[in-house]
Amino acid sequence: MTIIAISIMNVVIGIAILGVILRKKIMPNQKFQRIFILGVQGILIVLSGIMLIGCEGTDIINRISPYINMVTVYSNNVNINIGYSIDGISAIFIFLTIILILSCNLISIRVIKEKTEQKFQIMLLLTEILIINFFAATDLVQLYIVYEATLIPMVIMIGVWGSRTEKKIAAFQILIYTLIGSIFMLMSIGILYSTLGTTDYIMIREYIDVLPENVRKLIFIGFFIGFAVKIPIAPLHLWLLRAHVEAPTAGSVLLAGILLKLGGYGYIRYNIGLFPDLCEYYFPIIGGICLISILYTGIATLTQLDVKRIVAYSSISHMNVIVLGLFSGVLQGIEGGIILMIGHGVVSGGLFLCIGVIYDRCKTRIVYAYNNLVHVMPIMAILFFLLVLGNIAFPITSNFVGELLIFIGLIKKNIIIAFFSALSMIVTAIYSFWLYNRIFFVNEIIKREANEVISSKGQIVADMNALFLIEDVMKKKEERGIDDIGQPKEVKKEQLIYSDVNIFEFTSISLMVIMMIIIGMKPSVVEGFIAINCLELISK
């Protein structure tokens, strides 16, 4: 049933893409097209729910195992088997992908211009079908092709719908970084095919131990570097910062919410799944690199002014904590890493949704330009606060469960690495609450600029509310001739919108908050799908 569901998903998304392309003939009304797209996402959610039910308590290791609840269908082409297999881990990531795409559809209704909305929806659907096929792939060549193809719609989204002047540079940078990393991944696949004569994942798992130790190490390093770019691990993280700053809201949500998880999923399948002994061997090196990344990005976050860069650095820090958990080789660490990947997907995705809404209203992302928005956007203030709690791993949130399990696993593995990685929680709490306070409450820098404005107007204003401050502080920014990243920019008064979230924005952000709380309050919802897989990873 699970493979039938994945096949139907591909057909449904294909029909949706065709429907969007032919919308002028089939759906001349823009409203009907949006209803059609949302209906497609609803069908996909139902199908992914069926997969989740069918995959609970399954693994991908042995096709004829009584624990397997799947069917694998192959078509042979040049000795490369192309097929699909779904287990608990891949099913839950597919579900996350569909939820995030739905949120992107909802958040883009207002901000994407009508004349380009058709092309934008096609890019979202292409991203969705490629990511779903990545998580369901059983062949390494199939996986590599889909892995690379996910770049195409993302590069187009950033290059065409990006919000800044350097969007084309960002699109080129993400392309170059990922392609260079993929060379190492392709090298590992080539070695596997030349030595074992197959690229089928199940067959490789069965015979991987017969390879010489040096060959196995070379394959391991190739996969590690290839997926490290996507995580990303410092110093391979530079592409992500520019990509987030330049990307449209939906692009940032997909980058943080699911595309970074391709690297984590790759580690689970092709590093930990194939070489658990080498994970143990290289853990001190991997742990040291991740610790440097965690501490560096945490401290760097405190120096940022662009709110997107703040969340981007936070995202890198969390992903490196995930890598520590996955490579710990301890059951709790691996389970925590997977749960935190899901939690990070909804929390960071939700934060980027919030930032996109605020940017749509205020036309700036520089943190000092915001002040007292709680009076103008009270609902947004509540949603943002809940997501901040998730970002700092507050109890009853998904990130709390994931980080707790990771640190339990790290304590069992290496107490020193566990101690220093735990410092990231303190740093995360500092910049998360600092960011929230800067956006929604009064800060001293804005007070000084506001007082200058008040003095120049000769007015006495007791309540320096957000409506007044956004307009006049932005005028002062215009006088100084700077924008979010130090480049000339003109912000017109008529561009500013003073309103809280609309129904589409509220729904998209609420989906993230609800998933975060459900996983946090009942982690067994996720553990039921991944437990057998994690046990298998540590027992190989």
Curated annotation (Swiss-Prot):
Amino-acid biosynthesis among keywords: no
Chief localization: mitochondrion
Record Pfam families: Proton_antipo_M (PF00361)
Record GO biological process: aerobic respiration; ATP synthesis coupled electron transport; electron transport coupled proton transport
PANTHER family in the record: NADH-UBIQUINONE OXIDOREDUCTASE CHAIN 4
Broadest EC class assigned to this enzyme: translocase
Transmembrane regions listed in the UniProt entry: 2-22, 35-55, 89-109, 118-138, 140-160, 172-192, 218-238, 248-268, 282-302, 310-330, 338-358, 376-396, 415-435, 501-521
GO MF, one annotated term: NADH dehydrogenase (ubiquinone) activity
EC annotation from Swiss-Prot or TrEMBL: 7.1.1.2
Membrane topology summary: Multi-pass membrane protein
Protein name, UniProt field: NADH-ubiquinone oxidoreductase chain 4
Family the entry assigns: Belongs to the complex I subunit 4 family.
Function: Core subunit of the mitochondrial membrane respiratory chain NADH dehydrogenase (Complex I) that is believed to belong to the minimal assembly required for catalysis. Complex I functions in the transfer of electrons from NADH to the respiratory chain. The immediate electron acceptor for the enzyme is believed to be ubiquinone.
A cellular component term, taken from the record's GO annotations: respiratory chain complex I
UniProt KW Acetylation keyword: no
Catalysis performed (reactions): a ubiquinone + NADH + 5 H(+)(in) = a ubiquinol + NAD(+) + 4 H(+)(out)
Annotated keywords: Electron transport, Membrane, Mitochondrion, NAD, Respiratory chain, Translocase, Transmembrane, Transmembrane helix, Transport, Ubiquinone
Localization per record: Mitochondrion membrane
